[in-house]
Design a protein with these regions (language model features):
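Class I Rossmann-like S-adenosyl-L-methionine
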Residues: 1-204
């Protein structure tokens, strides 16, 4: 893929995730810039945003499952391949409206578009294991409550330990689950320019 080619939603999400990993960029700034550069419509922009934030919220869990079925440890994979696997795995596990076949096929095609045709077979094989086991994924390692919650909800262990100390295991798990929930889109109306009724009418007609 050349720099001048416009990207789709999945490629935009991948580019944003790679910028976050490589350059410690703010995810929202990277996303806004890439969405604007590639002129995504509102639907694709929302899809790219969901993929990017969803992967970030579940990164540790996704990497654990990738490691279950990949010959290489996730941290040793090329960043672009690791990102593609994370995006594919996230769609399979967390996005009911995305057909599993589409998640796998798009990941394979994205691998080829990124100039890694030799890795396409591996990406296909790993994500097919996600599909085969998505209702019964491998058990997480047995360990302390903090270790389990940190991996399950992809939060740093120091934070989990702090929460456990403050509110106990049940409240900690509830907080972590809520923190990973998909955030609803909200619209704030500028009363100096329009009214809530006018905005509602515009979107209903």
């Amino acid at each position: 893929m050349t720099p001048r080619e416009k990207c789709g939603a999945r490629d935009v999400a991948l580019d944003a995730l790679m910028q976050v990993d490589k350059a410690n960029a703010w995810s929202d700034e990277a996303l806004r810039r890439l969405i604007a550069q590639n002129r995504l419509d509102s639907r694709d922009a929302a899809f790219a945003t969901r993929l990017c934030y969803g992967v970030m919220q579940n990164r540790m869990l996704l990497d654990y499952y990738i490691g279950c079925w990949c010959a290489q440890k996730p941290e040793r994979l090329e960043p672009v391949i690791r990102g593609i696997l994370r995006i594919g795995g996230y769609q399979i596990l967390f996005m009911d409206k995305v057909p599993h076949r589409a998640a796998v096929n798009e990941a394979v095609e994205m691998t080829r578009r990124r100039g890694r045709p030799k890795a396409a077979g591996m990406v296909n094989a790993v994500l097919r294991r996600f599909v085969e086991h998505w209702m019964n994924m491998p058990d997480l390692p047995k360990g302390s409550t903090a270790d389990y919650l940190s991996l399950r909800y992809s939060h740093p262990k120091w934070l989990v330990l702090r929460l456990l100390d403050l509110v106990g295991p049940d409240e900690t798990q509830a907080f972590l689950r809520l923190d990973n929930d998909t955030v609803p889109t909200c619209i704030q109306v500028n009363p100096l320019r329009t009214t809530a009724e006018a905005v509602s009418y515009t979107h209903l007609t």
